[in-house]
Swiss-Prot record:
Protein's job: Catalyzes the interconversion of 2-phosphoglycerate and 3-phosphoglycerate.
Cross-referenced PANTHER family: PHOSPHOGLYCERATE MUTASE
Active site: H9, E87
Pathway linked to the protein: Carbohydrate degradation; glycolysis; pyruvate from D-glyceraldehyde 3-phosphate: step 3/5
Source organism of this protein record: Latilactobacillus sakei subsp. sakei (strain 23K) (Lactobacillus sakei subsp. sakei)
Pfam families: His_Phos_1
Keyword set includes Isomerase: yes
UniProt-recorded name of the protein: 2,3-bisphosphoglycerate-dependent phosphoglycerate mutase 1
Length: 235
C-alpha cells in the first residue's frame, strides 16, 4: 500500500484580486501562508511520512510546498519541480478580473471557459519566454489550454514520476493548483468529462488517497477544508 496526498497552494495575490492567473507567477498572501502552515499541521497530525514531493514551477505552489515540509519537519525530502504540474494556462484571460470578463464576454461564455472540460480560452499570441521554461520545447509551451489539454500535459508526469513511487509503496506528496489537481482527480477516480465540473479543491486544502499494490484506490478523503468563495476556486 502507498498514500498520495495532494494539496492546493494557499491563497495567492491573484485569488485575492479575483483575477485569472494560470502561468503568471504570483505570490502568496499572508492568508495563503497561514493556510499552508495549517494544512501542513493537518498532514503532520495524520501521520504521513513521504518519500518525495512534487510541485510546479510557480512560486505560489513552491512556497506552499516548503511551508508544508517545514511543518512536517521533512525539509530534506527530495523535491521535483515540473512545468507539467503548472496551473491550467488561461491564455489571454490571464490578469483579467473575473467580474470584468463577465461584463465583456457574457456570463455564459465565461462559465464555459472556466468549467467546461474541453473549452479553450482566447489564446495568447506567443507562449511564455520566462527563463524557468528554458528546458521546455517551445512547441510544448501552451498559449492557452482547456482542462482536457492540461490533463494531457499532466499525464506523462503522473505516469513516469509519481506512479512508480506509489507502486514501490512510497508515500508521495503533490502540491499544485486548482485545475491541475482537478485533472489529477479526474484521472485517479475516472470521473467523466461532465462530472468533473463539480469537483473542487480549495486553497490550502489537502486530499489523500490510499492505493493498493495495483494502484486501486482503497480509501480517500479530505484532510483540511479551506474557506473560499466561488471566485477563488481556480488559479
Amino acid at each position: 500500500m502507498a498514500n498520495l496526498v495532494i494539496v492546493r497552494h494557499g491563497e495567492s495575490v491573484a485569488n485575492q484580486l479575483k483575477t485569472y492567473t494560470g502561468w503568471s507567477d504570483v505570490a502568496l498572501t499572508a492568508k495563503g501562508r497561514q493556510q499552508a502552515h495549517q494544512v501542513g499541521r493537518q498532514i503532520k497530525d495524520a501521520g504521513f511520512q513521504f518519500s518525495h514531493v512534487h510541485t510546479s514551477l510557480l512560486k505560489r505552489a513552491i512556497l506552499t510546498s516548503y511551508i508544508v515540509l517545514e511543518e512536517l519537519d521533512q525539509l530534506a525530502l527530495p523535491m521535483t519541480k515540473s512545468w507539467r504540474l503548472n496551473e491550467r494556462h488561461y491564455g489571454a484571460l490571464r490578469g483579467l478580473n473575473k467580474d470584468t470578463t463577465r461584463t465583456i464576454f457574457g456570463v455564459h461564455q465565461v462559465a464555459r471557459w472556466r468549467r467546461s472540460y474541453t473549452a479553450l480560452p482566447p489564446l495568447l499570441i506567443r507562449s511564455s519566454t520566462a527563463r524557468r521554461y528554458r528546458l521546455v520545447p517551445r512547441k510544448s509551451r501552451p498559449r492557452g489550454e482547456s482542462l482536457a489539454q492540461a490533463t494531457q500535459r499532466l499525464l506523462p508526469y503522473w505516469q513516469d514520476q509519481v506512479v512508480p513511487g506509489l507502486l514501490a509503496g512510497q508515500d508521495q506528496l503533490i502540491v499544485a493548483h486548482g485545475s491541475t489537481l482537478r485533472a489529477l482527480i479526474k484521472v485517479i477516480e475516472q470521473i467523466s468529462d461532465q462530472a468533473i465540473d463539480g469537483v473542487e479543491v480549495a486553497n490550502g486544502e489537502a486530499l489523500y488517497y490510499q492505493f493498493g499494490t495495483d494502484l486501486t484506490v482503497l480509501k480517500k478523503g479530505r484532510l483540511a477544508l479551506g474557506s473560499e468563495t466561488d471566485e477563488e476556486k481556480e488559479n
